[in-house]
């Protein structure tokens, strides 16, 4: 049953995903975010930028980006100076939590049109040096993005998140072979989808003023995801089997630096470091209908869950049921699940724990959407 306050997806866009220090390395997170916002607003057809009432953008590595990165991106995209903007830092689920924030504003009747999404430039994340106590520099990607600051009963604060993935392997009995097979299949699907043009509608080609490796020359237009284009066809199971385990005891866990005898998580079964941004335009059903905006999907429910950070890997199995309850749906009603592949073990663990079917990419924050012509 429809409602005037239904949260409808009326526009979407994303940049290509650039590899670490790759094609988009010369562009800041703010520049990438503004491109995604412009593309999303343009995809709505008749929507004027002045109609956007609020912006929520996920952004984790904000050190050195200046005040209010979300506002910077919104203004650079041509939105009004009167638009309130908020940055969300929830690590891997920052962008999806931004979607939830925007959806709740619409559902509460506070807003009719919001822009939501996320942006990141891991290539531009700076090094950090303590003001006192020595001048040793720490990369902010490692400190702010890849290290557990809270710890738990088994992993100390400062542990690499990859050790939590290894812990999940221990507790769930997931072996190296299963993770390599999952990673290989993920690369295969990404490569096949790219070749079939499945991402063409959502990617807004990004123009880099000049190659990031030189100080002048012609502009370069980036049209596709760099990691998939460079490695997708070659990242086979045989190649993945050659990689060494990436995480060792002593990676901040209080150990002695001794390598795990049976480490399973590798760079191939972990997420890449990358640059890019994505955005959605959300609108109330009433506003979308009155202004002839295309309704691409309806957000029916959301769910958040948390547990000890060393067990972040299985939090989606708690968030998914919460989202389904909020949407008054059951798992039998769901045609597609997406699970965040921070590590292959996350998808494998939650596929079994939540009794899900085919899984590709669910973050710790989950949304249930109705997508397609049926509104």
Where are these regions (language model features)?
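N-terminal extracellular/periplasmic Venus flytrap/periplasmic-binding protein-like
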Residues: 8, 13-15, 26, 30-35, ...
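Active-site pocket-shaping loop/turn-to-helix segments
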Residues: 14-41, 61-63, 86-100, 112, ...
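Conserved catalytic cysteine-centered active-site region
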Residues: 27, 59-113, 155-163, 234-272, ...
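Beta-strand segments within the central parallel beta-sheet cores of soluble alpha/beta enzyme folds
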Residues: 49-58, 84-89, 114-119, 178-185, ...
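Active-site-proximal alpha-helical scaffold in enzymes
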Residues: 89-120, 169-199, 279-286, 375
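Flexible glycine-/small-residue-enriched beta->alpha junction loops
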Residues: 113-168
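Active-site pocket-lining segment
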Residues: 164-166, 202-204, 300-358, 370-375
């Amino acid at each position: 049953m429809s409602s005037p306050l239904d949260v409808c997806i009326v526009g979407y866009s994303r940049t290509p995903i650039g590899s670490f220090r790759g094609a988009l390395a010369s562009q800041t997170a703010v520049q990438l975010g503004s491109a995604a916002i412009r593309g999303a607003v343009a995809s709505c057809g008749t929507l004027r930028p002045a109609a956007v009432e609020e912006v929520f953008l996920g952004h984790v590595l904000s050190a050195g980006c200046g005040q209010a990165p979300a506002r910077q991106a919104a203004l650079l995209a041509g939105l009004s100076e009167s638009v309130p903007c908020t940055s969300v830092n929830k690590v891997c689920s920052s962008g999806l939590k931004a979607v939830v924030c925007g959806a709740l504003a619409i559902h509460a009747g506070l807003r009719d049109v919001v822009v939501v999404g996320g942006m990141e430039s891991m290539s531009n994340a700076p090094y950090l040096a303590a003001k006192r106590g020595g001048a040793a520099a720490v990369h902010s990607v490692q400190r702010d993005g890849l290290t557990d600051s809270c710890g738990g009963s088994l992993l100390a604060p400062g542990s690499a998140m990859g050790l939590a993935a290894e812990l999940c392997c221990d507790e769930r009995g997931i072996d190296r072979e299963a993770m390599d097979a999952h990673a290989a299949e993920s690369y295969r699907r990404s490569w096949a989808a790219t070749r079939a043009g499945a991402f063409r509608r959502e990617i807004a080609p990004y123009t880099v003023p000049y190659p990031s490796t030189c100080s002048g020359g012609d502009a370069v237009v980036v049209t596709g995801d760099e990691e998939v284009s460079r490695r997708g066809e070659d990242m086979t199971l045989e190649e993945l089997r050659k990689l060494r385990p990436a995480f060792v005891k002593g990676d901040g866990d209080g150990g002695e630096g001794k390598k795990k005898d049976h480490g399973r998580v590798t760079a191939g079964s972990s997420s890449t470091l990358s640059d890019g941004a994505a955005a959605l335009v959300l609108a109330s059903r009433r506003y979308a209908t009155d202004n002839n905006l295309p309704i691409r999907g309806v957000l029916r429910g959301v769910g958040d869950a948390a547990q000890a950070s060393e067990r972040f890997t299985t939090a989606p199995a708690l968030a998914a049921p919460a989202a389904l309850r909020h949407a008054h749906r059951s798992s039998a009603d769901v045609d597609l699940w997406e699970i965040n592949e921070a590590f292959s073990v996350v998808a494998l663990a939650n596929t079994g724990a939540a009794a899900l079917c085919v899984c590709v990419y669910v973050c710790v924050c989950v949304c249930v959407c109705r997508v397609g012509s049926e509104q």
